[in-house]
Structures are given as structure tokens and as C-alpha cells.
């Protein structure tokens, strides 16, 4: 049933907190895809994960997703005893190499003040902006971008 905006105030509805199950995810994806298509955009959401191992032990991982024309790094973790040994840098390079030549514009990531801001800058990321946490500066969010050739 189509609802005109002028009739919306007459629609009875309830809003509840629910688990994000497959039914809700399917609804969200379907509606987003329709809206994107109506605007001539293709999302192509594709999650990724690369894992570093040593002697069958996971020592690092990077995960995220590519969609629209961007790559988003959600998580980058290196086991504490292996930090500072180039593993994180190699994981970033692996992401770059995996998406090289596929038409992506940039890689985005976000980190907190207590995390690895210097690391991302060392890897060639530029700081776009900082979202300040007024109660705890360690939780300031640093938003980084790296443009691809």
C-alpha cells in the first residue's frame, strides 16, 4: 500500500527495538538497493578480511568492505607480541594490492586517540578530521583517507 506523505500522520505504527536478523537485513538491503538504483548508483557491497598467520597462529587481521567507489577498513588488529614488526603495514599493503586497478577512489578508516593514529599516517593516510570526545580525549575519533592512483 503506497502512502502519500500528507497521509503519513494518519498511519498507525509502533517502533520497537529488535535483533538485526535476516528479515530486517533483507528489508534494509532491498530498500537501499532500490533507492541507489533510482539514483543511478550501484553499491556492490563486498566484505573482505585478510589474516596474517605464523606457525598456524593468527597474528593479525584486517577486515572491512568495499562499496560504491570506496574501501572501508573496519578493523585492523595485530597481536601485541608482533606489533612493530611490519605486520600491520603488510596487511594495509595487501588491502591496497587486492583492490588495485578496480576503479576504487580511496581507502577510509577511523581510529581512536588511544589507538594507532601514527601508524595510519606512516602508511600514507591523510587525517581528514577529528571528532572530539568531550569527556575522554582517548576516545577522540580520527578519520583517515588514502587516495588510490
Regions found by a protein language model. Give the residues of each.
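Conserved N-terminal entry element of GNAT/NAT acetyltransferase domains
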Residues: 1-21, 149
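Conserved acetyl-CoA-binding loop-helix of GNAT-fold acetyltransferases
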Residues: 84-97, 122
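Short glycine/proline-centered loop/turn elements that form peptide/ligand docking sites
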Residues: 88, 92, 113-116, 133-140
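Conserved catalytic-core motifs of GNAT/GCN5-like acyltransferases
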Residues: 108-110, 126-143
Amino acid at each position: 500500500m503506497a502512502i502519500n506523505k500528507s497521509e503519513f500522520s494518519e498511519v498507525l505504527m509502533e517502533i520497537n527495538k529488535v535483533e538485526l536478523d535476516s528479515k530486517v537485513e533483507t528489508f534494509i538491503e532491498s530498500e537501499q538497493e532500490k533507492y541507489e538504483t533510482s539514483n543511478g548508483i550501484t553499491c556492490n557491497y563486498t566484505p573482505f578480511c585478510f589474516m596474517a598467520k605464523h606457525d598456524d597462529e593468527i597474528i593479525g587481521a584486517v577486515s572491512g568492505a568495499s562499496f560504491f567507489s570506496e574501501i572501508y577498513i573496519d578493523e585492523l588488529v595485530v597481536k601485541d607480541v608482533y606489533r612493530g614488526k611490519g605486520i600491520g603495514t603488510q596487511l594495509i599493503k595487501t588491502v591496497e594490492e587486492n583492490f588495485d586497478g578496480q576503479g576504487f577512489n580511496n581507502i577510509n578508516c577511523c581510529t581512536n586517540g588511544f589507538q594507532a593514529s601514527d601508524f595510519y599516517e606512516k602508511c600514507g593516510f591523510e587525517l581528514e578530521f577529528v571528532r572530539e570526545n568531550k569527556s575522554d580525549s582517548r576516545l577522540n575519533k580520527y578519520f583517515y583517507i588514502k587516495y588510490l592512483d
